[in-house]
A protein has these predicted regions:
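Surface-exposed loop/interface segments of Gram-negative outer-membrane beta-barrel transport/assembly proteins
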Residues: 1-14, 25, 55-62, 66, ...
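N-terminal entry motif of extracellular EGF-like repeats
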Residues: 16-18
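Outer-membrane beta-barrel initiation region
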Residues: 21-26, 35-39
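Outer-membrane beta-barrel architecture
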Residues: 32-36, 47, 70, 159-161, ...
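Outer-membrane beta-barrel strand-turn architecture
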Residues: 38-41, 73-77, 164-170, 234-237
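Short coil-to-beta-strand
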Residues: 40-44, 200-201
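Periplasmic plug
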Residues: 45-47, 82
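Transmembrane beta-strand segments that form the barrel wall of outer-membrane beta-barrel proteins
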Residues: 48-54
Length: 254
């Protein structure tokens, strides 16, 4: 018991895997700029925003950029056209840990690793230890050693409309939308060496870690939408008359 309390001799040390996996402070920032304006017949709004954040676990990152433009203009007193244009760039960077969710695997490692098990062979940080759960050894939790799993999403959306107001209570409006989404996954789980220390020979015996893989997925989905609408509203003395006629169509490609 005294040796465990001292924690200095090999085989009698304990290891805090929470401190190895989690960070106390992580940076986050958000930048936003917008402009509004116009004239007697035209109005516009433009906004650009960017968000960046590191995770509580090392080498995990997230960033997103958004763009939004709204504009409408009166061609005549009765005829109006307008558009809403938006775009998004979103990326997550993960470490190539076992399983589909790197965050979950990083947290799970704190419970899987034994506190009396060193992450490094002979406590030498040059050699990753051959532990009972090699894929969950935090000593390998970096993009340079374990690999990476990155997800990138790019999206653009355009909504355009034209509206005409007749003098007798009828309004005609046509709307067209186009959406394009591209999703890309790029993952590479590296093969790296793990070591067992031979105390008698003072050597480190290496063996490759198992379960390595490489995957890339690229998917684009364009979608289209159209709407034609007639609205009629009229008040005759104490009577209100209204009617709506519409037509919609949409399609998308996989």
């Amino acid at each position: 018991l005294a040796k465990w309390e001292a924690g200095t001799e090999p085989g009698y040390k304990s290891y805090d895997y929470y401190d190895m996996v989690m960070r106390k402070n992580v940076p986050q920032y958000h930048i936003n700029a917008n402009v509004t304006g116009g004239s007697e017949r035209t109005n516009y709004y433009l906004s650009v925003a960017h968000t960046g954040q590191d995770a509580m676990m090392r080498d995990f990152k997230y960033e997103r950029t958004n763009l939004q433009l709204n504009i409408d203009t009166k061609i005549t007193d009765r005829f109006t056209i307008g558009a809403q244009i938006s775009g998004k760039y979103e990326k997550t960077e993960d470490v190539g840990l076992p399983g589909g969710d790197g965050y979950y695997s990083a947290i799970l490692s704190m419970f899987k690793m034994q506190p009396i098990e060193s992450p490094y062979a002979n406590d030498n940080p040059e050699y990753i230890n051959n532990v009972h759960e090699n894929g969950y050894n935090p000593a390998a939790f970096s993009r340079d050693i374990a690999g990476y799993k990155d997800n990138l999403t790019r999206n653009a959306n355009i909504n355009a409309y034209a509206q005409y107001d007749f003098s007798f209570g009828l309004t005609a409006k046509a709307t067209f939308s186009y959406n394009y989404t591209n999703s890309r996954f790029d993952g590479y789980q590296y093969a790296y060496q793990i070591y067992t220390y031979d105390k008698e020979k003072d050597t480190y015996n290496g063996t490759p870690a198992v379960g390595r893989w490489r995957s890339q997925i690229d998917r684009s989905v364009p979608a289209r939408y159209m709407q034609l609408q007639l609205n009629y509203a009229k008040q005759i003395k104490n009577h209100n008359i209204s009617a709506v006629l519409g037509y919609e169509a949409s399609d998308y490609d996989w």
